[in-house]
Design a protein with these regions (language model features):
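Short loop/turn segments that connect beta-strands within beta-propeller blades
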Residues: 35-39, 137-141
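Beta-propeller domains
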Residues: 1-37
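Beta-strand C-termini and the immediately following turn/loop, strongest in propeller blades
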Residues: 17-23, 82-85, 93-98, 122-125, ...
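Residue position within the beta-strands of beta-propeller blades
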Residues: 15-19, 33, 90-96, 100-101, ...
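Structural motif
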Residues: 24-35, 100-115, 120-121, 128-134
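Surface-exposed loop and turn segments in beta-propeller and other repeat-based domains
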Residues: 1, 37-73, 150-164
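Short consensus segments that form the blades of beta-propeller domains
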Residues: 6, 21-24, 69-72, 119-127
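Structural signature of eukaryotic scaffold interfaces centered on beta-propeller domains
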Residues: 2-14, 70-88, 157-184
Length: 187
């Protein structure tokens, strides 16, 4: 069971969401872009787009192989994301890279990065997540650290404060349609 959390509008008109199971491994999720303007369901476009679009309505927001099930996630996991409204499409996010526990020569576990070789060899004991602040550039397909993670510290929320126009207010009801307009006039 997947939940879509923290929806945020993106400059491209889509919604950025965190897809996360109810019990998320390592507090992590996958980032998705959801096309709410053209779809009503994953593979069901709106009526004007019927026969034109086939889906899916949601696609990964990054190029990383992120998995939301127990065990290693080769592309790491995300804990929060905030699209920058600066015309670049970049996303400020918190991310933990994939880390494994490997038994050292002295029998002690050491933290090592995920690699295709380690994953193919069955190294599935994951290390505790290490969330830092990153910036993702979809045009360049790059992720760069903004704040280097520190063992024992979790960066869990990011926001970008910048001036922008207020979004439109969608009222629950419309006077004269959903209720008597005279009642609204009376206050």
């Amino acid at each position: 069971e997947i939940h879509f959390l923290d929806p945020r509008p993106m400059a491209n008109g889509k919604l950025l969401v965190r897809a996360q199971p109810f019990e998320a491994p390592d507090l992590g999720s996958q980032l998705l872009e959801v096309d709410t303007d053209n779809y009503v369901e994953l593979a069901q476009p709106t009526l004007p787009n019927r026969g034109v679009l086939a889906g899916p309505a949601q696609v990964p927001a990054t190029i990383n192989d992120v998995r939301t099930v127990e065990g290693p996630s080769p592309g790491g996991r995300y804990n929060s994301a905030f699209p920058l409204q600066d015309g670049t499409g970049r996303i400020l996010l918190t991310r933990s890279q994939c880390r494994l526990l490997e038994q050292g020569a002295a029998g002690t576990a050491q933290i090592v990065p995920c690699s295709p070789e380690r994953l193919a060899a069955g190294a599935t004991a994951t290390a505790a997540p290490l969330y830092g602040v990153w910036i993702y550039d979809p045009a360049q397909k790059t992720q760069l650290p903004v704040s280097t993670p520190v063992e024992g510290t979790v960066y869990s929320d990011v926001v970008a404060m910048q001036p922008r126009a207020l979004p439109p207010v969608l009222l629950d009801r419309i006077a004269g349609v959903d209720y008597d307009a005279d009642l609204e006039a009376e206050g």
